[in-house]
Amino acid sequence: MPNRKASRNAYYFFVQEKIPELRRRGLPVARVADAIPYCSADWALLREEEKEKYAEMAREWRAAQGKDSGPSEKQKPVFTPLRKPGMLVPKQNVSPPDMSTLSLKGDQALLGGIFYFLNIFSHGELPPHCEQRFLPCEIGCVKYSLQEGIMADFHSFINPGEIPRGFRFHCQAASDSSHKIPISNFERGHNQATVLQNLYRFIHPNPGNWPPIYCKSDDRTRVNWCLKHMAKASEIRQDLQLLTVEDLVVGIYQQKFLKEPSKTWIRSLLDVAMWDYSSNTRCKWHEENDILFCALAVCKKIAYCISNSLATLFGIQLTEAHVPLQDYEASNSVTPKMVVLDAGRYQKLRVGSSGFSHFNSANQEQRSNTPIGDYPSRAKISGQNSSVRGRGITRLLESISNSSSNIHKFSNCDTSLSSYMSQKDGYKSFSSLS
């Protein structure tokens, strides 16, 4: 019989590391083979750089067994055992399937390409040892292109089926904290097989190759599991190619600018809140109940973010199909009144911090008597390099000199200010300053 120890790979060492945790849960795991069924879901959630740790452990083990030095091994040179982690050649993690399925040649192919954004909500997430990890309750999908924007959308509530025993409170709490869809007796929920068949007809109405489907990387495990779970109850089984939106945006940037943006920047681009309450974004039920979390809204906001970021780079005129124009224009407009208020606040802060608090009452009285047309000059004066006390006196003198009817009032003000400032140590009289 072959030597079973020779088949140790990265997954073997990952399972070996998880055994103590599984035993603390009370699971009957005596060896690695017993723990493998409980670790597959956690392994799928790991990123490539996290899996590299266990791959290195497997390479070191094979090196110790003398398996890597033989000429019959058909491994690439970059995967030979290296003791120093700094010498490891990093693997390219740009998701090659994403780039090959795009088949983009030039800007016209980018603009005319059709993309489907999908999301499925669940009543929480059950522990890894449970056979049913998720309970799908809502699905949303949009058909999108850079040129046309959102071309069509699909939405449906899903009957999650029977809640596993002992997890009803857990599922109810997860629902109440997010989408608030009832976990049972929800009249809008449809059969899982029917929903999946309707989704297939939406994304693949004509014969031919099935298009790739995109979702956020954080939702990929849940969406992929729900699709396979729903396919079990359907007579039509189709393995959809589920890719990540982050890799799609990276591919578009690489095609257009020949350089790759960071995944952190891509995630910050997609995680925005400016369209959370935009009209025609959430489904009708979530809109009527004023609930923020909606599967259809997640898909539409992905399209909004991509349009907002990439459409201008391709010279596309934004329409209602790209972004909610009313909210988009409101978020990019600045009213002059806001600028004036900020300028006034800035001047008041500068006056208070400079120690000349005795000019505050005079300045406030002057501002209340200043017409609206003087606001731009005030905002301009605040950027000069003169002292705050000098600016205040200058504005006072200019406004008084422009009013010929207030000459008598000016003489009274001169006398009062002179008598007041003569009492302060280190200050000259008002007449000497003028």
From Swiss-Prot:
Subunit: Interacts with SMARCB1, SIN3B and DDX4. Interacts with piRNA-associated proteins TDRD1, PIWIL1 and PIWIL2. Interacts with TEX19.
The protein, known as: Protein maelstrom homolog
Cross-referenced CDD domains: HMG-box_MAEL
Gene3D superfamilies: High mobility group box domain
Record GO terms (molecular function): sequence-specific DNA binding
Gene Ontology terms: cellular component: cytoplasm; nucleus; P granule; piP-body
InterPro entries: HMG_box_dom, HMG_box_dom_sf, Maelstrom, Protein_maelstrom
Keywords: Cytoplasm, Developmental protein, Differentiation, DNA-binding, Meiosis, Nucleus, RNA-mediated gene silencing, Spermatogenesis
Designated gene of the protein: MAEL
GO BP, one annotated term: spermatogenesis
Subcellular location: Cytoplasm; Nucleus
Record function comment: Plays a central role during spermatogenesis by repressing transposable elements and preventing their mobilization, which is essential for the germline integrity. Acts via the piRNA metabolic process, which mediates the repression of transposable elements during meiosis by forming complexes composed of piRNAs and Piwi proteins and governs the methylation and subsequent repression of transposons. Its association with piP-bodies suggests a participation in the secondary piRNAs metabolic process. Required for the localization of germ-cell factors to the meiotic nuage.
Pfam families xref list: HMG_box_2 (PF09011), Maelstrom (PF13017)
